[in-house]
Amino acid sequence: MDKWEYWLLVVLVFGSQFLSIPDATAQKNSLIVNVKNINRSEGKIYVALYTSNANYLKNDAISKCENALEGNLEIEFSDLPPGEYAVCVIHDLNGNENLDKNFLGVPKEGFGFLNGMMGNFGPPPFEKVKFTWNGAGAKIEVPLRYL
């Protein structure tokens, strides 16, 4: 082995640790929201995380939006501070960024809360759908309902 081959081998073996290689564990500190039971692949899926009862179901939320896919869809939230959160998901079929309701107030689009929780004649209270996020990787499930 000549001098150039030796240095090439050294660079390849030891230099590879300094290359920017995507980390396979990039999701370990992320919260994954698994939206289940999406009944069609049109419209958008909105996922909102609320930090308190005071901002629950108001516009002050940590949110993400993805194109709808029939079946299940995973949406990742990274860099969330530890704390209590409530999650709400809507399947916005017409793109107006709201949960459309009929004249009786019954949702016309898909919606869901943590673990499929339902309220009596309205959304469930914050206390029923909150969870504690400790900053470590986790996955939660939100099944959608269509009425």
Residue ranges and their predicted role:
Residues 1-28:
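Bacterial Sec-dependent N-terminal signal peptides
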Residues 29-37, 47, 142:
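A short, amphipathic beta-strand motif
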Residues 40-55:
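Short, ordered, surface-exposed loop/turn motifs in non-cytosolic proteins
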Residues 71, 76, 81-84:
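A glycine-anchored, Pro-Gly-centered beta-turn/N-cap motif
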Residues 85-89:
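A short tyrosine-centered beta-strand micro-motif
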Residues 93-99:
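Acidic, glycine-anchored loop motifs typical of Ca2+
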Residues 109-146:
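Extracellular beta-sheet/turn segments enriched in Thr/Pro/Gly and aliphatic residues
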